[in-house]
Structure formats: C-alpha cells, structure tokens
Amino acid sequence: MLNYNHNQIEKKWQDYWDENKTFKTNDNLGQKKFYALDMFPYPSGAGLHVGHPEGYTATDIISRYKRMQGYNVLHPMGWDAFGLPAEQYALDTGNDPREFTKKNIQTFKRQIKELGFSYDWDREVNTTDPEYYKWTQWIFIQLYNKGLAYVDEVAVNWCPALGTVLSNEEVIDGVSERGGHPVYRKPMKQWVLKITEYADQLLADLDDLDWPESLKDMQRNWIGRSEGAKVSFDVDNTEGKVEVFTTRPDTIYGASFLVLSPEHALVNSITTDEYKEKVKAYQTEASKKSDLERTDLAKDKSGVFTGAYAINPLSGEKVQIWIADYVLSTYGTGAIMAVPAHDDRDYEFAKKFDLPIIEVIEGGNVEEAAYTGEGKHINSGELDGLENEAAITKAIQLLEQKGAGEKKVNYKLRDWLFSRQRYWGEPIPVIHWEDGTMTTVPEEELPLLLPETDEIKPSGTGESPLANIDSFVNVVDEKTGMKGRRETNTMPQWAGSCWYYLRYIDPKNENMLADPEKLKHWLPVDLYIGGVEHAVLHLLYARFWHKVLYDLGIVPTKEPFQKLFNQGMILGEGNEKMSKSKGNVINPDDIVQSHGADTLRLYEMFMGPLDAAIAWSEKGLDGSRRFLDRVWRLMVNEDGTLSSKIVTTNNKSLDKVYNQTVKKVTEDFETLGFNTAISQLMVFINECYKVDEVYKPYIEGFVKMLAPIAPHIGEELWSKLGHEESITYQPWPTYDEALLVDDEVEIVVQVNGKLRAKIKIAKDTSKEEMQEIALSNDNVKASIEGKDIMKVIAVPQKLVNIVAK
C-alpha cells in the first residue's frame, strides 16, 4: 500500500516557505487585519514538549484560514528569555546565561519550524536583546514619571545560606526548594508598581472582553474589590491608633478583641514589658512561614496577647490587642477587628484563647458556632432592630460623626512587587545619589546594558549579583561631580512579557516603541491562545501596562487582547500530568520523525475539544496518520501522478457532502472546534471512496480545508493538482445553500397504519405520482392483494397511507 513520505515532503515545503518568505506580513494598512498571538515560550533547556504545539497549532490554523479569507494576518513568535532557570544554570555551572539562552532558543526555533507554523520570522523578538529591553526600560521610566513606580520596604523571603532572596514559588514549608535551607521574612527596599491605581478599570473593562467567564472570574477574585468601612480604634494610654478595614461595620458592637499581623508597625511600641519576650518569639516563628501556610483555614490558630488594649469607638468598651499570623500585613491595614460571634476564624480564635463572644445579630446559637447569616441587630445600641444593609449605613454614619471611621473600598489586589535580587533580568534604569535623591537614566542613554560577568554569584547581602560589579554600580555625575550608585535589582520575568505583543507590530523601530499608525492598524490582538496558568498574573500585568500606555497616548485601545482562549493540557497515557520525573514526557521531535509534523498537528487538534485536558494516545496518533495516508492514496498513484479518479466533470454524487463539509468546517474554525471540523473532513473522504469519480474542484476545496491543519501535505497535494503557487493565499472555499439539502427524500408507505415500504423519490414529486409509485411497490402490492382500496392519502415529501379492506 502506498503511503506518503512525510520526511521528504515536510522538509521540501519548509524550505520553500523559508526561501519565498511565504508568511511575511506586510503592513498594508488598508487591508482588513487579523492578529493571532501565541503566548511566547520560555526557552528552557528541555526544549519543546507536545503541550506547546497544541496552542500553537490552533492559532496557526486560524492564521492560515484568515489568510485564505483575504485578511492581512499578523502571526509572530518570540522568546520570553529572562528568568530564573537560566540564572540557576549560570550559578550551578559558572557559564554565562546568554550562551545557555542562545542555545535553547536555537533548539526551540528548529523544533517550531519543523512543525510547519506560519510565523513571520522577520518579526521575532527576544526579551533579553538590548534593542528589545531598551523599550522595557523606557516603559519603566514612563511609569516612574507618572508616579506609578515607587520604592517601599517590603518583606521578602531571605535565605542566608544561599545569600539571596527567593520568590514565593522557591520556598516550600519555610525552607528553600534548592538545598532545603531555612528562609526568613526580612524587610528590604524594593521597587513596587502601583497597579492598585488601575484596579477599578481592570475590573470594569473585563466586561467588554471575549474571554472565558471562568478566567474573568479569576481576575475579579484576584482584584477582590469589597466595600466597607475604615475604622479607627484608639490604643488605651498611648497616642497610637489601630486602623482596620471591615466589610461589616454593623457588627462593631460585637468586636471583642483586635488582631494585628506580627509585622504590624505598632506591635513593638504597644507591647507591654510583661509580654515582650513572647511577642518577639512569635514574630520570629511567623517570619518562617509563607502567606499560604499562615492563612490555611485548616491549621490550628495561634497567637499571643500584647498586653495592650484598645477602645471600641462606638461601645466605649476596652478590648484586648493580640497578634496572630493568620492576619497578613499585606492585606487591608494588617489589622482586624474580631467579631467571634459572627465570623468562623475569629470564633475559633476566641474559643482557643477564652476571649469574649458577644452576639450582635440574632438567629444563631453562639454557644455552639459563629452565626454568619442575616438577621436583626441586638446588643448594638442605636443599631438595634435594624437588618444588615440599614445597619451598615447607620454604623458608618455614627463612625463618621465620631471621627472614628469612613466608608471605604478595599482591594485584595496588592501593588506589584517589581524588583528581583537577580542578575538575569532587565537592569532598572535608576541611579541613587549620595545626597539621597534618585533619578532615572536619561532616555537617550537607553538601553542600560546588563554587564557581562564571568562570575554570577549571590551578593550575600540580599542585593542582586550586580552589586558585586563596581564598574556597573558606581557612577559620577559629569556636571556636579556627585557620586551615585546604580539600582542593582533587576526587573521580574513578567516585565518583558507585558508588552511583547506591541513590539511584534514594529520590531525594528529604533526611535519609538512602535509606529502609532501600525499600532492603530493591528490592535487589539484578535485571538490570544495560551495556558490557563497565566490567567491572573501575566494577563493582569499586561492589561495594566497597556492601560498606562493608553493613558499616555501611546496605544490606541484600552485593552490588549480582545479574544482569549485557554487550550487544555495534554496528559500522559495514564491520565497524569507529563513530567520528567514520571518519565512520560513525549518529545515532538520523535513524533515528527516517526509520523510527521502534519500527523502531530492533526492528532492534537482531533484529540478532543481544544480546552479539554486529554490523555495522549499512541493509537490516536496512528489513526491520524492513517487518515492522511487515505487522503494521499485517494489522490495520488503509486508513480506519484494524480489519480484518474479525479475528473473535471461533476456527476453530482458528492454535491451534498462537499457543501456540508465546507459549511461545517468554516463554522467550526470560527469557534475553534477543530476536532469536529476534522471529523467532517473524514466523512467527506469516506464518501469519496464510495464513488467512482471525484469532481476536481471539490477535491481542491477539500485540500484547501485540510491545509491549515496539515500544511505540508496540503501544499504537496495542491501542487499535484497542477498548481504552481503556494496554497497559502488561495481563496477559502464557499458553499451553495441549495446543495446542502438532497434533491431526493425518503417517504414511508403504510397500509392500514402498518409500515410496508420506504421509498426514495424526487423532492418535487406530486401527490398523484406519489400514489402511483407507492401502489407499484412489490411489498405494498402483496399487502393489498385481494383487498379493496378505500382511500389513499399522500403527504408530499413524507408518506403515503393506504386504507384497504
């Protein structure tokens, strides 16, 4: 049996596309546009795995489909190449992360090219290229000038043994993931970006986006907007005040103690001598825990009394002030008013430490559990008898009259901690002068280059390894002679990925981030496909930067990504996640070698819905290859010539299935329903095998529909059909509505209500003809033999009913 040689064909067409720059995007600003974007990969040492091509194939199908529909398509690829793994490699081996990164990019690029994606490689970007990060630094300066970048003392994960600060992901159960060394929370000066200033816009504009609702909800929850009140409690016998944010100011009469986070600025000044030692010990223990561990609902509550008291502003009662690690310094004000009768966590804490529980809303039994439902207020002074909403309004009014509180909107969203104590990242373009001032590097001096060094090692002080490089750090102002030190922290990996989709639009521009006319033409991104693991951070940060750039008049749209889609995960054969440790990772190189890139692309799209998590199956892969072989055998003779089965006259036998196929595939491509589109292509090929002749324009239409999914075999078959030019820009097939339905219908014939025959007749058969056809059918004749026909009822296109006695 003749099968096609995928190695030969795939190499041939990849070379052709490269030599002819088939997918080069021209900035034809008058043409209708489509911008299809992939989440660009981090080029790790492991290379591409079979999960990557799933999303890439989907955007590639859409890009190829849109080109055939006459769109000007922007479909680029690049590298998110700063980041921890390269730095780790450099620390472990002493090699420069640049070499490691360059080598990895070469591997990724080869693998991606071998999969036949239609990227315009002239637009490739790399976040570690100085010509790229020049503009990342430029955006930072705009943020700084707008008052959105500031320095703050922030508690970080400090690991003395490694001499470095770790990200939350690198700390597991209070020790470093690498080496298992103790990690402590330590305050350090850090750069922070004021994303909270955009919280309301980030929330409101989600409504206009064509994104999965579940993903929008993840962003809404992350921003976490809540309305309530800020309340001030005076600390007894001192000038201090404890400020709390609460969504339930109506329960203030039930606030029987306050809880501060162990890091709260007031703790040390209000703690009495008697409790100092206990408080200090508790603070040290808390500094070893991650926020996640501290807020784990299942864990046993811990805390210590400070010896200090506060005054409840409405009841005038004295209440104890405690510290506990379940209160985080980063949320709200870092302090809470505890209302144990009506909050589960506070109830648990009060029971453990024998603190008062005051019921202020009726409806529960606070002897047994906290009551968190609705009800009338009791034991609440002027709020007695009021329901929740009315009581909240009244409580805020009373607090405002006393100068002890006000209405407030709070966000769970924190400002974005932007500095990293790392070498392999974008240098932050700031100089700290000896007189205590700081300035940004003049824009004309950008990029501020990351210095090359043969020794990347932790500074030991918590600063980045850049602090070791005197020639980089120390500067002198030429005009004034004042000495300064460059900022030694670098930007996080998120920085470069916040705006890469803008640089693709004008990647070689030396004078500006991108030409405004081109930005106006291409934005917003029409389709963005990537993994759900970036649902919150990357997408939120990119939206934030985009909104700042919009306010600065640099980009023309409020939002970067109009439609977003998350592909599902490809699991191992046993339904578990693919991982090196399980030894179930599948390398696309092996599949390209054994089955071909077209088979891999077809299989990954045919596995199931694009957003579902599905297990890899060798049988499924083989099945996809068999389908391509069947297509090949239908069209190509053993000697490589076109089969004589393909003819230029239409005997109408495939009219219906062909037009159905064009309609179905077109509709499915629009909704990213590639698995059902492929099923329909298979239906068409099955029908072709059942007939003696296949009408050439129909098989050409089929090849056009197959080509976006399996482009190499698509090009090869297109050339076998006698075409000299690439299939890339051929017009997408259209269908004829009239041919979607049969010219024939099947009718049933009943004798005395019993089914006697099913007969195919022309659609426009008259009632009289229907009766004649029915009565001449052999089965019907046998049923009415020797009987008198009383009545014949014919319903066009449906049935003939014969009544006989």
Swiss-Prot record:
Domain of life (superkingdom): Bacteria
Residues spanned by motif 'KMSKS' region: 577-581
Keyword terms of this UniProt record: Aminoacyl-tRNA synthetase, ATP-binding, Cytoplasm, Ligase, Nucleotide-binding, Protein biosynthesis
Any one Gene Ontology molecular-function term assigned to this protein's record: aminoacyl-tRNA deacylase activity
Sequence motif: 'HIGH' region, positions: 41-52
InterPro entries with a match to the protein in the record: aa-tRNA-synth_I_CS, aa-tRNA-synth_Ia, Leu-tRNA-ligase, Leu_tRNA-synth_edit, M/V/L/I-tRNA-synth_anticd-bd, Methionyl/Leucyl_tRNA_Synth, Rossmann-like_a/b/a_fold, tRNAsynth_Ia_anticodon-bd
One GO cellular component term noted in the UniProt record for this chain: cytosol
Catalytic activity as recorded in UniProt: tRNA(Leu) + L-leucine + ATP = L-leucyl-tRNA(Leu) + AMP + diphosphate
EC number(s) per entry: 6.1.1.4
A GO BP annotation: leucyl-tRNA aminoacylation
A Pfam cross-reference name: Anticodon_1
Location in the cell: Cytoplasm
Residues the entry annotates as binding ATP: K580
Main location: cytoplasm
Similarity field: Belongs to the class-I aminoacyl-tRNA synthetase family.
Name of protein: Leucine--tRNA ligase
Native species: Staphylococcus aureus (strain JH9)
